[in-house]
Regions:
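Signature of the catalytic double-stranded beta-helix
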Residues: 1-27, 32-34, 38
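Hydrophobic/aromatic-lined pockets within catalytic cores
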Residues: 2-6, 54, 115
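Generic preference for hydrophobic/aromatic residues in regular secondary structure cores
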Residues: 11-24, 60-66, 83, 93
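A structural signal for short, well-ordered beta-strand segments
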Residues: 18, 49, 107-111
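Short, solvent-exposed loop/turn segments at secondary-structure junctions
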Residues: 21, 25-27, 38, 54-56, ...
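Catalytic core of non-heme Fe(II) oxygenases with the double-stranded beta-helix
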Residues: 29-85, 104, 118
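Catalytic core of Fe(II)/2-oxoglutarate
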Residues: 70-147
């Protein structure tokens, strides 16, 4: 996570705990079209991470645009063990009704270098807020897709 935050940062602020999301076959969309900048306590420097624990494709996946304002929405296709990092602060994303026979179980969180964290990230270490962690070098990121 740390290298995706840019530069030689030594510490990163990470959303804790990650959000777990479930979508059963036949369930409606879980979140509408949005970018994270509309929510309080989100900074432009944050990097979104999405980790599906089940195969995701077509309507049981997250849909997003390739760059801010592109409006070229497409579903993300990933297998368990793969992750997606993306600019959710500026790129719009959403889900649709799950018309597949596969449930979606996923985790998502945001991370930002400590030096770029906005002043509203003050409750470090509290449940449901953020954690300050030491950065470590990447050993292998071949299972990470970036948008």
């Amino acid at each position: 996570v740390a290298p995706s935050c840019g530069g030689a940062t030594q510490r990163i602020v990470v959303q804790m705990p990650p959000t777990i999301r479930l979508s059963l076959p036949g369930s409606p969309a879980t979140i509408g079209l949005h970018s994270d900048q509309v929510y309080p306590n989100h900074t432009a420097a944050e990097v979104n991470w999405w980790l599906p624990l089940t195969p995701v494709y077509e309507s049981n996946s997250l849909w997003l645009e390739s760059r801010p304002g592109a409006e070229d929405y497409r579903p993300v296709t990933l297998s368990p063990g793969e992750a997606l990092r993306f600019n959710g602060h500026e790129c719009r994303h959403f889900t649709v009704a799950n018309e597949t026979d596969t449930s979606r179980v996923s985790l998502d969180w945001r991370a930002v270098p400590e030096e770029l964290a906005c002043g509203t990230l003050t409750r470090i270490g509290e449940f449901g807020e953020v954690a300050l962690v030491e950065a470590s070098p990447v050993v292998d990121d071949h299972n990470v897709q970036g948008v």
